[in-house]
From Swiss-Prot:
NCBIfam families: eIF-1A, PRK04012.1-3, PRK04012.1-5. The gene is eIF1A. Gene3D superfamilies: Nucleic acid-binding proteins (2.40.50.140). The keyword Transport does not apply. This is Translation initiation factor 1A. GO terms for molecular function: RNA binding; translation initiation factor activity. Residues 18-92 form the S1-like domain. Belongs to the eIF-1A family. InterPro entries: NA-bd_OB-fold (IPR012340), RNA-binding_domain_S1_IF1 (IPR006196), TIF_eIF-1A (IPR001253), TIF_eIF-1A_CS (IPR018104). Seems to be required for maximal rate of protein biosynthesis. Enhances ribosome dissociation into subunits and stabilizes the binding of the initiator Met-tRNA(I) to 40 S ribosomal subunits. The keyword Nucleotidyltransferase does not apply.
Length: 105
């Protein structure tokens, strides 16, 4: 039987399916890289538009996901202060490899 492909998933080299969340440009989400841990749930991030912002880890992912320097993230810049943003998602290593292979990063 043939294999059914889905638009939301891709098969990696070892045969496992990788699902990757992409930034939604309509709500100003963008890629960023964690540069410096500042403590108290704040991180300095370099966004894909070239701006360095102060990122705040949202309460939803505060205790569930550990963010380290160098991690690739999805952030949403604030409407009223462009030098600050909310961190809403962290990519795992296989997801980052997939993003690089498909030229998103």
């Amino acid at each position: 039987m043939g294999r059914i492909e889905n638009d939301n998933q891709d098969v990696s080299d070892d045969g496992s399916i990788i699902r990757v969340k992409l930034p939604n440009k309509r709500i100003r989400e963008q890629f960023a890289q964690a540069e410096l841990m500042l403590g108290s749930n704040h991180i300095r991030v370099r966004c894909s538009d070239g701006v360095t912002r102060l990122g705040r880890i949202k309460g939803k992912i505060k205790k569930r996901v550990w963010i380290r320097e160098g991690d690739i993230l999805i952030v949403v810049p604030w409407d009223f202060q462009d030098d600050k943003c909310d961190i809403i998602y962290r990519y795992t290593t296989p997801q980052v490899d997939w993003l690089r292979a498909h030229k998103y990063l």
